[in-house]
């Protein structure tokens, strides 16, 4: 039985005061959550959030990482820097990184390998746009995104990754993916993972990242191949985030 994972992605949001309030509320409302919980915060807040999460059953995560080990790469953050703040997870290949920063499947694969080599758990994001969805290209696009990553890692490392499906077409467009539609893609991803390592594929958690909210979390999380959520907007509101955590 795969333990659910609810990971909040704060994106480019937060402040010292707001972070303190948000994490204090989340910690106090966590109770005996049966899922794993993580927050992926902007890098300037690593030290603050590390302190706020001390002793809490909430893991710290990053929103991106460099494909390089160290050196003259202005603005980049390395895996060794993440390790110093006890980061456990790192998001790679988020749809916003692909769209706004021209990240390729190959670069995302390099970041995945870099994270694994550092003992971090990469949350590998895949997903299709509205145009791709309407052209019937969902399976081919998502499969190719994951294939490039899978080709870059050892079969023995498969169980060390997390996959997140982000239907880009369902984020901020007014369109929604039903639980059945999400499950269909998650099942396809699971089958793809099984081709790499059948046993490990059953351990890999596949998160749903298409605007999971308190209103739809329970239905989505009831699907057999939806193992948690990568939460955007709802992660910035303690009550909403906690509702999703407890739905898991």
Curated annotation (Swiss-Prot):
Record InterPro entries: Aldolase_TIM, TIM_sf, TrioseP_Isoase_bac/euk, Triosephosphate_isomerase, Triosephosphate_isomerase_AS
Molecular functions (GO terms): triose-phosphate isomerase activity
Subcellular compartments: Cytoplasm
EC code: 5.3.1.1
Catalytic activity annotation: D-glyceraldehyde 3-phosphate = dihydroxyacetone phosphate
Keyword Isomerase (UniProt): yes
Pathway: Carbohydrate biosynthesis; gluconeogenesis; Carbohydrate degradation; glycolysis; D-glyceraldehyde 3-phosphate from glycerone phosphate: step 1/1
Chain positions recorded as substrate binding sites: 9-11, 172, 211, 232-233
Any single biological process term in GO: glycerol catabolic process
Domain of life: Bacteria
One term under GO cellular component: cytosol
Active-site residue numbers: 94, 166
A Pfam family annotated for this UniProt entry: TIM
Sorted UniProt keywords: Cytoplasm, Gluconeogenesis, Glycolysis, Isomerase
Task performed by this protein: Involved in the gluconeogenesis. Catalyzes stereospecifically the conversion of dihydroxyacetone phosphate (DHAP) to D-glyceraldehyde-3-phosphate (G3P).
Similarity remark: Belongs to the triosephosphate isomerase family.
Subunit description: Homodimer.
Protein name per the record: Triosephosphate isomerase
């Amino acid at each position: 039985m795969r333990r659910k994972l609810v990971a909040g992605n704060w994106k480019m949001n937060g402040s010292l005061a707001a972070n303190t309030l948000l994490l204090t509320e989340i910690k106090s409302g966590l109770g005996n959550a049966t899922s794993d919980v993580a927050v992926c915060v902007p890098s300037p807040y690593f030290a603050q959030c590390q302190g706020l999460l001390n002793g809490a059953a909430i893991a710290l995560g990053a929103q991106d990482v460099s494909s390089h080990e160290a050196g003259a790469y202005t603005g980049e953050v390395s895996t060794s820097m993440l390790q110093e703040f006890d980061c456990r997870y790192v998001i790679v290949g988020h749809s916003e990184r692909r769209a706004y920063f021209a990240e390729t499947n190959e670069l995302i694969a390099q970041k995945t390998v870099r994270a694994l080599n550092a003992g971090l758990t990469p949350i590998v994001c895949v997903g299709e746009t509205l145009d791709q969805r309407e052209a019937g290209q969902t399976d081919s696009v998502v499969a190719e995104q994951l294939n490039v990553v899978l080709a870059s890692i050892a079969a023995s490392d498969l169980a060390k990754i997390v996959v997140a499906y982000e239907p880009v077409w369902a984020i901020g467009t007014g369109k929604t993916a039903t639980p059945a539609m999400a499950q269909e893609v998650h099942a396809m991803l699971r089958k793809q993972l099984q081709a790499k390592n059948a046993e490990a594929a059953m351990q890999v958690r596949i998160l749903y990242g298409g605007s999971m909210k308190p209103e739809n979390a329970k239905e989505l999380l009831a699907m057999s191949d939806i193992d948690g959520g990568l939460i955007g907007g709802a992660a910035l509101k303690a009550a909403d985030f906690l509702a999703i955590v407890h739905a898991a």
